Amino acid sequence: MATQVLIAHSGQRLQIDTSRLTTLDEFRSAVSRSTSIPQNCIIALVPPGKALRPQAIQMEKEIFVYDSRMTQTGAPGSPFPVKLEIDLPKPYAITNPPNDIIDTRSLESWQDLFRERRVWAHRLSEDCEGMEKEAHDQYEAMDNMLSCLDAAVANLESVVRATENKYEDLKKWAATEQTGYNDLVTRWEQNLGLARSIPISAAMVRLMTGKDVTGAKGRPSKQATLEDLVDLDCARKEGRRAPTVLRKFNARIADLEKAEGRLMQNFEELEAEFRRVISRSVMGHSQDATQLLQDIQALAGKVENDYRTTMDYSTSTRDLLQASKIAQTHTEKHLPSLHKRALEMDGMLRYAIKARNALALEQAEFMRSIADVSKLDMQVKSLINAIAEDEELATFDYLRLIHQVPYMYAAFTAEAIRRKEWFDKVKTDSTTLANEMALFQDEEAKRRRKWYKTIGDTSYGPESLSTDNNVPGLEVNLLGEDELWPSTSRKDLEEFLDLLQRQRADASIIGDVGKIIAELSNPTKQQFKRLKAFKNGSVHDSALGRSGLMIRGDDELLRSLQDDKTKLETKLRTAESRVRRLEDLLHRQGQASRPTLGNLFQNPSQQLPERSGSAQSVGSPGPIGDRRQSDEVGNQLVQRVAQLEKELQEEKERNAALERDAADRTTHTNDIKAQMDDVNATKKDLLENMEAQKREFLVERKALDEEIRNLKARLEETEDEFHNIDESREHEKTSYDEKVQLLEAQLESLTKEKSDDALKAQGQVDFLRNETRLQRESNEALQAQIQASQDELGLLNKKLKTTNEAADVQLRALRELYTTFVKSAGIPEDVNDLADTVLNNAAETLAKVQNLDADISIMRSNLALAQDVAKDLRAQQANALEKLAKEETTSMHLREQCDEHKAKVNALEGELADGRKQLDELRTQIAQGETGSESLRTRLEEEEKKIVRLTEDLASKQSQVGSLEEELRLFQERLQDSQSKLTTLTLRTETRNERTKDISQRLYSQNERLVRLLERLGFSVSRENGVMTIQKIPRAERSTMNLAASSTADAKSRIASEPADVELLYWMNATDVQGETEKYDKFMSTLGSFDVDAFADTVYRRVKDVEHIARKLQRDVRGYREKTHALHKDAHDKIAFRNFKEGDLALFLPTRNQTNGAWAAFNIGFPHYFLREQEHHRLSNREWLVARITRVQEKVVDLSKSLDTTESINGTSGGAEDDNDNPFDLSDGLRWYLIDAQEDKPGAPSTPGLGKTTVASTKVEAKGDMQTQPRSTPGGLAVLGGAKPSAVDGASKSLSKSLESRRSSTSSTRRPLPFAGALSRNAPGSETNSLRAVATTAPGDGAGSPSGPTSPKPHLAHGEDQDVRLAALPEPQQQRVEVRNDSGGGAIDSLLGPT
């Protein structure tokens, strides 16, 4: 099974197979291969916080690994050698969910929309799943970090606690030692004086010190004292040193206390900080991402299920409406919720990464703190070891020896006494043994001689039998006499104790000497065994010792044995007296219960008459005549007495037998009791012995357990010390390596300085070369500055690119905001959609404003940074130009010097040539033998020296010229490179100026657009003294501002294009730095200033107002929806007369044109709705039809088609009529509608009779008059009973217009009413009303007495070929139609609805 290896600083979890790893180096190598930690920097711990051991590598399940580089202490805030933080991911960019549809009436378009949304939701779910996994990994890394940190703190705690225990032990020892040392320092002279005043035996002094204190001829020169046992010089020396050593010791103890206090304080602070880190842990949020992912997957699954559901839909209108509702639910709830939860998941991921980075930094700081505490712990341990191993404390040992001299003398004296007594006992016992063996030998010899005499002289046996005197004997010799110790006695030791008491020595010394004297009387081990031989109720032979020697002649032992014997005899007598008292008590109890002899065999009833009879015979004197009778009675009495005596004798024998039996039983009982007492006593002794052994075993076991724990603790401490020693060695090795590197660097620097000094010591050429080298270094520094400038330019370009991207993002956001608020495609008809749209737009506006605020601040900071960098570059450019000018001047001087040197060289060459010519001439003259040879030779030598000098000068000048030419060439190359770099920098500066100009223009345009946005939202913006003020415009003034919007925009554009503003926009084109700064400040205070905080607050308040309005509208919409549902429910059974659509209930009546079978829907203002005839309608037998519309087709009459096509279309039936756009012979260009309808309640009678009804809830009474009746209006019905014309007459007139007038009117097109259009989605058929015709019981009810507003009778009619024909009953005179509303309201209002 692989071992889990946790990396502390990164939270990484590795799985390493440790089955083949046997050493720590192999484990470190395996970890180093899997991580970036060097092998020598790996520290391994196991979960209890202990160091990893080689023998436990294969058995550990988890191992914590730390990087020792993280423990290297540095300055606060200094960077760590390892990168701890991980970069935050880019913000998760979510595309808007698909919301575009091509055709709302096409099912395929809806399915495509659902498919795109499903793909979008699936992709979003996968992204969220990845983010959730990454967040889970971060939380797991934090858990691993906390586990490693816990193990490190536990390890530190074990080390610190062990050090604390050592410190406590040392503190206890030091407390007593300090007191003892103080006493020794203050009383050593007093102790020495005491020793001087106490006499001792000179022989003991000789034995203990080897010095002879006696004088010549064996006479003592002085009395030996305890002072002779002490080296006085050494004592005085140590006594003088003792105060200094004591001060040092106290100072070390104080330093140790301070160090230990700092150690414990730092450790407690570290432990408290660790507890705070644990309490602040974010691990409680580790499951939030998982729960959020489950919600996201549930929503994505809902979108998936809805997509599959829509794939099963047909092309029916009902399915289209259902698909539209599902899409609307997605748009309002599911997709925004997915979008919001995805952003929450991204936020959770970023939160987890930030928490992980913060924990990594805290963990690294903890490791540094742990390293500091460990170093302090090592300091405390070193102080403890230094105190414990201090060699100067030997001073106090010698002073303590002075204090303990009486005890040492008493100990040696007691030892001498023991040895003398032991030797005397050995001699006595050996002599006694030899004497006893001699007696045994003599007795054996006598027995043999006597035996030989008894058997007589026989021939049996060996020949030497008669003279056999060789009896085995025993010879005792003492070997190896002990060294000669002085002869002392107990009396001498007791006198020494008395002397100490008189001298008022230390009480502890007196007590120790008294203990020594008392221990002299203690028996030996064998003697103690004999004394304790009686154990557990019996005497054990093994407890008597191996021999009977070494106890004879011991008076003390005999006295102790006699005391034990006396005690045992006393116990025996006490037990015997107790037994006698018990026997006496038992005997008395037996006598009290025994019967008397007189009444032994008689009952009391028998004894009383006899006694009374005898009394009467004795007391009453009988007559003489009665003597015979009395004699007979007397004989009987004699016989009776004899018989009673005989029975008495038998009873005595029987009683004696019973007494003997009782005595035997009593004896037996006593024996049994005695045995029971012995058994109980034995048992008691055994139990006590076992209890004693148990207590001894428990004490011994506790002692052994304590010793085992101490040994284990010492073992762990030793291992920790070994581990710390290894770490300290590694740290020391690292520090030594650093010191070696530092020394090497210093050595190299010294070597370089030495070489520089040697180079400086050269001549002029070397000096010029050094100058050239310095100039070259300056050029290299300039090149480095240019390279740094290029790097800064690259960074600035990156920042500029980032700024441009941010500006583009802001521009796009502003355009979208402008499009959303100003150029909207249209206002939604539903109030819910309107409220949701306003809320969404407001939320998006606020979010974009906040992003824009951050981007503007970043852009401003980047702009300021770019300005600073541009200034620095200009300064660097000026410095570079100055350096180039200086270099050109230097090069010109060098050229001049080079020319001068060349001229000098030419002159020297000319002089050299002249000298050579003169030399040649002189040589020729000498050769010719001219006079004056000596002067010529002198001249020749001078000329030769001059030539040599000129030659040397020429060589030096040539070398100088060569070096100068080389330097000139290098300067020219440097100059060319600097000029090219200067050109590049100039181009980049110009490019940066252009980009800065672009940024300024964009900043200005963005500020202007934000101002326009505020004005669009109904606010006015004003600036005074650099402060922007936003005020809300009253609603009354907004209309005038909207009317003047275009003119205001033109004015603003003109104002923005003023020369002053243009000049401020191009502030970077200023000629000098001061002018540029002034223009920039003016630009930032006027055009570039925009209070984003005020803008955000204004938009926020506006959003809150919109939310308040939206909530109010939602409450209104909720009420309207309830009313709509109620109206829809109420209108479901009412007949519609306008806005015909699918699901409405319509009344169809036959038109005048009966040839084509045209049936039209009864309507007001909505003509040309014709019924498609079906077989089940049975229209031939009907006068009217109430049916529910299932389909409405819009058609336009086109008479331009051929006649053949028209006839073929008219000749078809059913589906062929769908292609004929004029089946009812309508006018050309007329828009009409073909309706498919199903009868609402099939089975109604085709021709209802009088008093009958076709609809259960409708009562109709009609009377027709076939005679010609005058009409009040053309095309209308006569009003019966002389009633006044009602408001329906006007409707009848308008419906009876000619075809041409209707075609020219606007009523032939379908235009939705405003109110109906607003509620058409949620309340279909809301404007339909019920049409109910109530039959009257009398003909004159409705004609003669109209009841209020319900009495008027309308004349129902419609346009050309669609005049209404009421179904008439067979009454010949007239027909009368009365329409009433069951609810009691106006009949015409219920029929027509709100107008």
UniProtKB/Swiss-Prot annotation:
Specify whether Nucleotide-binding is a keyword of the entry.
no
Annotated stretches, region: Disordered: 586-632, 647-673, 1260-1395
Q: Does the keyword Protease apply?
A: no
Instruction: List the residue ranges forming a coiled coil, or say none.
Output: 123-172, 246-277, 555-591, 629-818, 862-986
Tell where it localizes: Preautophagosomal structure membrane; Vacuole membrane
Q: How does it sit in the membrane?
A: Peripheral membrane protein
Subunit comment: Homodimer.
According to its UniProt entry, what is the function of this protein?
Involved in cytoplasm to vacuole transport (Cvt), pexophagy, mitophagy and nucleophagy. Recruits mitochondria for their selective degradation via autophagy (mitophagy) during starvation. Works as scaffold proteins that recruit ATG proteins to the pre-autophagosome (PAS), the site of vesicle/autophagosome formation. Required for the Cvt vesicles completion.
Please give the family membership noted in the entry. Belongs to the ATG11 family.
Provide the protein name.
Answer: Autophagy-related protein 11
Q: Which organism is it from?
A: Pyricularia oryzae (strain 70-15 / ATCC MYA-4617 / FGSC 8958) (Rice blast fungus)
Provide the gene name from the record: ATG11
